[in-house]
């Protein structure tokens, strides 16, 4: 998984601070780690937006003004309901060798018999939760659907073992559906309206 450096600054949590930060193009955030006090920080809005909307997961190397760097993951993001801009973020520090849970984006590849028969790929999830050491977790997971038949669904328990390769494990119910090949939509035939018969008086 790629490591991205993100410069951060401490903040005071004073009244109206969040509003002031946003006018300066910054987003308030908090960083936490088990056994440590939470740290209140702010980050550049554009840099954070780029990370949040990236199609891949990243390890975030938070860079503080005193020169210290701490590895972290984005754990939660809040969006403005009107503008859809990021208005707050939670980061989690982690230590070397620490096992964490995180979401990893999913992509699909292949064109199997189900697609050849006119079926549609229906992605039922856009990310999967996995558990492992962050350095062993991929930035995205690609699932091959080239063997899937029309009407077939792949569940978490059916993801090939070589995807994780013993480096991480999937979290969630084994029966959770991930992707389906659905039947093509059949358009109903249009019927011509019959003109009412005219009667002679």
UniProtKB/Swiss-Prot annotation:
Keyword Hydrolase: no
Biased segments, Acidic residues type: 190-201
Residue intervals passing through the bilayer: none
Region (Disordered): 179-201
Keywords: Ribonucleoprotein, Ribosomal protein, RNA-binding, rRNA-binding
Any one of the GO CC terms: cytosolic large ribosomal subunit
Disulfide bonds: none
Listed GO MF terms: 5S rRNA binding; structural constituent of ribosome
GO biological process, alphabetically ordered: translation
InterPro entries: Rbsml_bL25/Gln-tRNA_synth_N (IPR020056), Ribosomal_bL25/Gln-tRNA_synth (IPR011035), Ribosomal_bL25_b-dom (IPR020057), Ribosomal_bL25_C (IPR037121), Ribosomal_bL25_long (IPR001021), Ribosomal_L25_dom (IPR029751), Ribosomal_uL5_bac-type (IPR020930)
Domain of life of the native organism: Bacteria
Family named by the database record: Belongs to the bacterial ribosomal protein bL25 family. CTC subfamily.
PANTHER family: RIBOSOMAL PROTEIN L25/GLN-TRNA SYNTHETASE, ANTI-CODON-BINDING DOMAIN-CONTAINING PROTEIN (PTHR33284), RIBOSOMAL PROTEIN L25_GLN-TRNA SYNTHETASE, ANTI-CODON-BINDING DOMAIN-CONTAINING PROTEIN (PTHR33284:SF1)
HAMAP family to which the protein is assigned, alphabetical: Ribosomal_bL25_CTC (MF_01334)
Function description: This is one of the proteins that binds to the 5S RNA in the ribosome where it forms part of the central protuberance.
Protein name according to UniProt: Large ribosomal subunit protein bL25
Species annotation: Prosthecochloris aestuarii (strain DSM 271 / SK 413)
């Amino acid at each position: 998984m790629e490591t991205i450096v993100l410069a951060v600054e401490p903040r005071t949590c004073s009244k109206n601070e969040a509003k002031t930060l946003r006018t300066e193009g910054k987003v308030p955030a908090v960083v936490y780690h088990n056994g440590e006090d939470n740290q209140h920080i702010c980050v550049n809005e554009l840099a954070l937006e780029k990370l949040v909307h990236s199609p891949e997961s990243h390890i975030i190397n938070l860079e503080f003004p005193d020169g210290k760097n701490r590895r972290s993951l984005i754990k939660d993001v809040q969006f403005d309901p009107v503008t859809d801009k990021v208005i707050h973020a939670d980061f989690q520090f982690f230590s070397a060798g620490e096992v964490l849970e995180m979401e990893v984006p999913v992509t699909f590849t292949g064109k199997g018999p189900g697609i050849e028969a006119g079926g549609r790929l229906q992605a039922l999830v856009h990310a999967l939760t996995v558990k492992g050491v962050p350095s062993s977790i991929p930035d995205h997971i690609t699932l091959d659907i080239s063997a899937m038949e029309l009407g077939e669904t792949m569940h978490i328990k059916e993801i090939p073992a070589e995807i994780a390769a013993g480096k991480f494990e999937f979290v969630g119910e084994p029966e959770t559906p991930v992707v389906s090949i659905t039947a093509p939509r059949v358009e109903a035939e249009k019927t011509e309206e019959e003109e009412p018969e005219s009667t002679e008086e």
